[in-house]
Design a protein with these regions (language model features):
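Short, active-site-adjacent cap segments at secondary-structure transitions
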Residues: 12, 57-59, 81-82, 148-150
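Acidic, low-complexity terminal tails and accessory targeting/binding regions
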Residues: 41, 75, 81-94, 138, ...
Length: 164
């Protein structure tokens, strides 16, 4: 099985450099263009399954890159973005030392209060991939988020700490 993992395209909140965890925001024009470019680069690959987190930005990106209707995208909440709690919608550059260092080294530092732990993120992403491994797919597309991609790659690369 070949697994294709990508992050969703740009949203207005991404453009404003705001932490966007569980806030449900659609793609902006740039994000739509990014997804179309990715589809072009992939070429004529057919995906046996197209998965996305339940957030609009991931579903839209998955439908475009996967070349399927939105209704055909398999939604799975285990690949939703990290819950940033009180840091949601804060500027990337104004997070403060605790969140900045945690996000740089989440496997070494405790999560700030209200922020989802790395253990939780790893547990749900590994559950998703272990279930996926049982499927008989040739090509699978997974469209999710920057945070969860770290734990998906950690599992696929067999990292001891479970995160990349």
């Amino acid at each position: 099985m070949k697994i294709w993992i990508t992050r969703h395209g740009q949203t207005a909140l991404n453009k404003q450099k705001l932490m966007q965890g569980l806030t449900d925001e659609p793609l902006n024009e740039t994000g739509i263009k990014q997804a179309k470019e990715a589809r072009k680069k992939i070429g004529d690959i057919h995906f046996d399954a197209v998965y996305a987190s339940p957030l609009q930005r991931a579903i839209q990106t998955a439908a475009i890159i996967g070349n399927v209707d939105k209704k055909d995208v398999k939604i799975d909440s285990r690949i939703i973005e990290v819950d940033f709690g009180d840091y949601e919608l804060r500027n990337y550059f104004k997070l403060g030392l605790k969140m900045t260092t945690y996000w740089a080294l989440p496997e070494l530092l405790p999560n700030p209060k209200s922020v989802e732990s790395v253990e939780s993120m790893i547990k749900r992403s590994q559950s998703f991939l272990k279930e996926l491994e049982k499927k008989n797919y040739e090509n699978v597309l997974i469209v999710c988020h920057g945070g969860i991609i770290r734990s998906l790659c950690g599992y696929l690369e067999d990292r001891k700490n479970g995160i990349k």
